[in-house]
Structures are given as structure tokens and as C-alpha cells.
Amino acid sequence: MLDAYKELRVDGGGAYIRLSSLENLKAVDAIVFDCDGVLIDARRSYDAAIRKSIQHIFTSLTGCRMPLSIIPIDVIYNLRLSGGFNFDWDSTYVITLMLFTSLPKDFQKAFSEVAQRLEGKTATQRLVSASSTLRGKLPKDYFQREGSKIKQKLKQLTKTKIADKDAAVGLLLQLAEREGYLQHLRDFIRFLNYPSEAKQSIISTVFDEFFYGAELFKQIYGFKGELGVKHGLIEKEERIVSLETLKALTEMLGEGRLGLATGRGSLAAKKTLGEALNYFNSKAMVFLEDLKYKMGGRDDLIRPYVKPEPYSLLEAVASIGGTNAVLYVGNSSEDFILVNKANKVKNIFLFAGCYALQNHSGKMLNLFAEAKAEMILPTVNALPKVLKVIKGEQG
């Protein structure tokens, strides 16, 4: 697959330029970046928030300590490989449902009986109320004893590509019907109330409190979190992109030619990127989480705008203006799907995939090569060197 590419040795590994795309890459006059995994290393924030949220939900519900190791990182990445899990809330939701299907039927039945009495309460109230009744329904060491079986089931369920959240829910409902716990799973789905507004959704409330911490959570939602999480996992993030990289790209392309298209909110981006944001065209930064809050926090209303739909990329480019060839830098399946969709609207987009700072980096490198990415980079910091080589190439 890599035979179709010219390889360059750069810091962090090999960079690859698709030979058939050289002329198009020479014409690049603007760059739009994804954020997580490209500009920001979010492995210790978003991935950890998924696992800690699920751990909190099941430890609270059952009264049994659930080790984080029950949720392998591979399960999260298996979901993302499909290109349909851009929202980490979706991944959290689907893995939570999968875990519920792994619990004994006696516990599921007890849960259904409790769930009937929980209508109308907020997310936190429902979780606290259910846990006060369900504690003691499982042996204290249940997750320690059954952990390896549950882990195996999660891996098995995510082994084949699941298109998106809705496909996953459909698959789990079919499984529940076959195995005789369909009503219990439906009750659990209703209990989680996802997607819905923040105060009513256990998934988004718990996830965001772990991710943002108390101060940012209150700024975003306008009310205090109830889990007592003082420091959010966002504080463990690190900036990948260097100021030198952004300066070099600005010198190459000119002022105002860098844009941002991300699912995260502006507050979260500013917290981690800091002064690096000064290099971006302020009108060409699209934060989908901000748009979601303008829509009343409704996850279902924002879906037509999120990756792999091309809205954020097209909006960013429209604000840059006067573009003939735009490089979009991403790190996932949905990123190159997004570029393909954007090209059906306006055929000016090229894709660069970053692979090194990921679990299974070799797999991602091959995935980008299979997708015929115009450029494959270890990290975004290789981009200035690669572009200089491209723009200096003859013929």
C-alpha cells in the first residue's frame, strides 16, 4: 500500500506523500485542523473520561467496585474505527449498554422494578435513587470475579465494525430479545435518557463533570455538578502542536490561512491550546459543542452537523475565503469520510492523517494508506517540513 507514497524521515517516524497527489498538494493554500489527536493529545482526558464515567455509573448502581481494567482501551478504539463514533458520549453510552447486558438477569429484573419509580427525576437523582435500592443485589466482588468474562464480551461485541450509536443499540436490542431480557434493556435505555438535555442525561452529565471538573462544568452548563469532581481530566491534556509549527505554516501560507474544525467547545480548546489559538483565523474556528449548547444542549439536534458530516470543515473554509486547495489534517476514519463528503460539495479538499500518537499506530498508518490519504504524518509537527519538500518538488 505504501508503494504509492514517497517516504520522508521526520521527527517521530515516517511521513508519506501520495505520489499521484503531488500536484494537488503543491497548490495547498489553506489548512484546517481537527483538534483531538492532532493539535491536542486527549488520550488521558477523553479516553479516561469514558472509562471513569462507566465505572462511576456501575459502581454507584451496584454498590460493587468496578475496576477500570474491565473496559479495555481497545473497545473504545474499535468503536471509533467505524467512523461513526465522533461523540465520546456515544461511545460511553454504547459501552454502558453493553456492560448492562453482561449483568445477571436477576439484577436486570431488580433494576426494571426500581426503574418504574424513577420517572421525572434529574439524572443525578435517578442514579442516587436507583443505587440506594439496588445495593446488595450483587456480591461485593462480582466485578473482580466476572471481570475477564465481561471484558471478553465487550471485545467480542466491538470486534466487527458497528456503524454508529443507533446501529449498536439495534444490535443490543436484538441480542436482548434472543436472550430474554429485552424489557430490562429497554428500561435501562430509558433510565440513561440519552440523548436529552444535560440535567436529564446520566451519560452527558457524568462524562462532562469528570472531563471538565467543577469550574468549567459550571461555566458551560450554568449549574453545579453533583459528583464533587474538583479537577477535570482535561487538565491532563497536552498540546501536540508546537508554536514553531504554527509559525512556520503561517509564514508559508500567509496570515489567516489556518482554520479549526472540532467537536469540542471553545472553552475546552482554549484551556489546552492557549496562545496557539492566536495563529488561527478567529472567524475560521468552528466549535460544534458551542453550537450544541446554542441548540439547548440537545444531542439529537446537533447530529446532522457532526463528523463525518462536513459542516464544520465547510464552515471553516468559507470563513478563510479564496481557497483553491485545502488540506484537512485529522487522525481518524471519520476524518477522511468527512473529506470525501466535503469534496462532493466543493472538490478542493485533500486529507492528511496523523498516526503516531494513537493506540495501534501501525494499524492507523495502514488505514490511511488504504483510504488513499494524500499525506500521512506521524504528528502535525512534521507538516511544515513535508510541505516544503512538496512545494520544492519538480514535476
Residue ranges with predicted function:
Residues 50-185:
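Conserved phosphoryl-transfer catalytic core
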Residues 286, 374-383:
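Short acidic-hydrophobic, aromatic-tinged amphipathic segments that line or gate anion-handling sites
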Residues 161-241, 248, 254-257, 262-265, ...:
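Long, low-complexity, polar/charged, intrinsically disordered or flexibly structured peripheral segments
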Residues 22, 58-63, 102-104, 247-251, ...:
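Alpha-helix termini
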Residues 262, 274, 328-376:
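Acidic, Mg2+-coordinating phosphoryl-transfer loop and its flanking beta/alpha structural elements
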Residues 380-395:
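C-terminal helix of von Willebrand factor
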Residues 218, 222-250, 257-327, 333-344:
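Substrate-recognition "cap/lid" segment bordering the active-site pocket of phosphatases
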Residues 2-74, 90-93:
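Active-site neighborhood of HAD-like aspartate-dependent phosphohydrolases
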